[in-house]
Swiss-Prot record:
CDD domains: OmpA_C-like (cd07185). It is found in: Cell outer membrane. This is Outer membrane protein A. The chain crosses the membrane at residues 27-37, 63-74, 78-86, 105-116, 121-129, 154-163, 168-175, 194-202. Residues 220-348 form the OmpA-like domain. It comes from Buchnera aphidicola subsp. Acyrthosiphon pisum (strain APS) (Acyrthosiphon pisum symbiotic bacterium). Belongs to the outer membrane OOP (TC 1.B.6) superfamily. OmpA family.
């Protein structure tokens, strides 16, 4: 029996998702509740009166209930809530000290499992536990919180909510409460219950569609490669050849003739294998910048031209020139490696 009571308490912890799965959006919400409660006054202290435990006429009492709740929505299907409830709240008796009335204050921690019918209308169930503030302040109560005689009241709620404009919450639900002792003895009759109407405010939103959207989805303005060109350079040089100017001018004309939209250009500079890695890295970048400067002089925006030096990492002549030893012959053989690869991107495929 004790294990059954422990299982109820650990149910909350088992349902809490990891923080890594929580959305970055603000999921907090706050609200107030009011309704009618059927509760056992013998479980609580009485204001201005003493109750005889043998008086069965007041063993159960129907009275108003008011409260506040604070919750966090991890996603449209799972939330965690804490509530503070006041049972037996009769405003007209607050200042009448001679009148007997019973009032209890309790705190509830619950998980809220929702089933969205639409983005605005949800059905839900809540599983949790309720303890009075007086019981929480008692060391003996805390010591026996997970025993058969526990003051903890496990609770089950069923309800529906409608959210206006993604922020204003309205709810209607009914909560059954029973003692751990009854549950441990396999009693399924709920002894206590609350019928409640709630209103609240969400500080953020969590759309159902966001649950199934991919983080690595393609951008809306995807660009396509529409033109390519290679420009070769002399050995150990960043100077453009006359033939290179002709190629770049033709590339400019082709872009204009195609009436491309949102054009961007990627320049990848390369060097041959002669020299150190650091020197060739700098040389490859400088070659790419030579072309960027010329294209900018033709009217291209510098912000739309990306430059990257590749050094000697991607040779085209690796197999052809592998056995060449004579340096002049090697320089001539490696000519295709001294290049800048140009790729023109556009929204139009």
């Amino acid at each position: 029996m004790k294990k059954r009571a422990l299982a109820i308490a650990f149910l909350l912890a088992s349902l809490i998702p990891s923080a890594a799965q929580a959305e970055e959006e603000n999921g907090w919400y706050l609200g107030a509740k009011f309704g009618w409660s059927h509760f056992n006054p013998l479980k609580y202290d009485m204001n201005n009166s003493q109750v005889n435990n043998n008086d069965s006429s007041i063993e159960n009492l129907s009275a108003p209930i008011v409260g506040l709740f604070l919750g966090y929505e991890f996603n449209p299907y799972f939330s965690l809530e804490i509530e503070n409830d006041t049972n037996g709240f009769f405003p007209h008796l607050i200042f009448q000290k001679n009148n007997e009335h019973i009032q209890s204050n309790s705190v509830q921690l619950a998980t809220k499992l929702s089933y969205p019918i639409t983005d605005e209308f949800h059905l839900y169930t809540k599983l949790g536990g309720i303890v009075s503030w007086n019981d929480l302040s008692s060391k003996n109560t805390l010591k026996n919180l997970f025993s058969k005689e526990s003051a903890l009241l496990p609770s089950l709620s069923l309800g529906a909510e409608y959210i206006f404009n993604e922020t204003f919450i309205t709810r209607l639900d009914y909560t059954w409460k029973n003692s751990v002792k009854n549950i441990a003895n396999a009693s399924i009759k709920p002894a206590l219950g609350d019928a409640v109407l709630s209103i609240g405010w969400k500080f953020g939103k969590s759309d159902i569609s966001d649950m199934f959207s991919s983080d690595d989805s393609e951008p809306l303005n995807e660009q396509y490669s529409v033109l390519n060109e290679n420009i070769n350079f002399p050995f150990n040089s960043t100077e453009l050849k006359p033939s290179s100017y002709d190629k770049l001018n033709k590339l400019d004309d082709d872009i204009k003739d195609m009436q491309l939209k949102n054009v961007s250009i990627v320049l990848l500079g390369h060097a041959d294998k002669i020299g150190s890695d650091e020197y060739n890295q700098k040389l490859s970048e400088d070659r790419a910048y030579s072309i960027k400067n010329y294209l900018a002089s033709r009217g291209f925006s510098r912000d739309k031209i990306t430059v990257k030096g590749m050094g000697k990492l991607y040779p085209l002549t690796n197999q052809v020139c592998r056995d060449v030893v004579n340096k002049p012959l090697l320089i001539s053989c490696l000519a295709p490696d001294r290049r800048v690869e140009i790729e023109v991107l556009s929204d139009v495929q």
